[in-house]
């Protein structure tokens, strides 16, 4: 009895008697609790690892998605640029397809005009057949130029305009103090454009000795003060 009185009410597991059924049950329960705790910790660690792995996969997928979006946007932009470039090339091909042909036809027109100008006026008055022939050639010239105009070929009318090397070719200078310097005063050979391109520059004579036009404000200054 003295031994039982000396036993503590809640003895430690190390002090349990394995041969005592009650102690053996307590030890078993403690072992089960320990295993459950370890399993719970392992499950929590595994779940945390799965969460981290899932988060990493999501981050990778988001990065891939962003890259694919960027690639798709770049492809779309390239396709749009290609579409515009193709459309522009088609428009240019349509507009300028007859460039070489038109240039050759202008040479023919020039020859017709030279032939007409070479016929003396008195010869036309004296010979009705020659006059009829001349009128036929002139009608042919006009019809040719009208046909070219319908296909986008336009005649340049530079007389009285300021000389522009992009559209005009200066052949000579004419002293004229009354006109601003470099004003087109005479057209030797007509120029032509097709679309926004020069098909053939106009050959012109320009004034010299007149007031210059200021590039800043458009005001005229005298040749001596320039």
Swiss-Prot record:
Entry keyword set: Chaperone, Cytoplasm, Stress response
Mitochondrion in keyword set: no
Primary location group: cytoplasm
Pfam families the UniProt entry points to: GrpE
Region (Disordered): 1-24, 205-226
Gene3D superfamilies, per the entry: 3.90.20.20, Head domain of nucleotide exchange factor GrpE (2.30.22.10)
Ranges of Polar residues composition bias in the record: 217-226
InterPro entries named in the record: GrpE, GrpE_coiled_coil, GrpE_head
UniProt keyword Cytoplasm present: yes
GO molecular-function terms, A-Z: adenyl-nucleotide exchange factor activity; protein homodimerization activity; protein-folding chaperone binding; unfolded protein binding
GO biological process, one term: protein folding
GO cellular component, one term: cytoplasm
Subcellular location, record wording: Cytoplasm
Known partners and oligomeric status: Homodimer.
Protein's job: Participates actively in the response to hyperosmotic and heat shock by preventing the aggregation of stress-denatured proteins, in association with DnaK and GrpE. It is the nucleotide exchange factor for DnaK and may function as a thermosensor. Unfolded proteins bind initially to DnaJ; upon interaction with the DnaJ-bound protein, DnaK hydrolyzes its bound ATP, resulting in the formation of a stable complex. GrpE releases ADP from DnaK; ATP binding to DnaK triggers the release of the substrate protein, thus completing the reaction cycle.
Family affiliation: Belongs to the GrpE family.
Protein name: Protein GrpE
Gene: grpE
């Amino acid at each position: 009895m003295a031994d039982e009185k000396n036993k503590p009410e809640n003895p430690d597991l190390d002090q349990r008697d394995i041969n005592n059924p009650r102690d053996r049950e307590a030890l078993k329960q403690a072992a089960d609790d320990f295993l459950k705790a370890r399993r719970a910790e392992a499950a929590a660690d595994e779940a945390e690892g799965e969460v981290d792995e899932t988060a990493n996969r999501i981050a990778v997928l988001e990065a891939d998605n962003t890259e694919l979006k960027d690639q798709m946007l770049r492809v779309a932009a390239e396709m749009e640029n290609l579409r515009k470039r193709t459309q522009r090339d088609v428009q240019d091909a349509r507009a300028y397809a007859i460039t070489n042909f038109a240039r050759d036809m202008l040479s023919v027109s020039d020859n017709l005009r030279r032939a007409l100008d070479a016929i003396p006026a008195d010869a036309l008055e004296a010979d009705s057949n020659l006059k009829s022939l001349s009128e036929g050639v002139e009608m042919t010239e006009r019809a040719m130029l009208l046909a070219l105009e319908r296909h986008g070929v336009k005649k340049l009318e530079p007389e009285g305009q300021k000389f522009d090397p992009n559209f005009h070719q200066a052949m000579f200078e004419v002293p004229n103090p009354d006109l601003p310097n470099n004003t087109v005063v005479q057209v030797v050979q007509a120029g032509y454009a097709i679309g926004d391109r020069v098909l053939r520059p106009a050959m012109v004579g320009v004034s010299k000795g007149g007031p210059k036009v200021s590039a800043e404000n458009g005001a005229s200054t005298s040749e001596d003060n320039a």
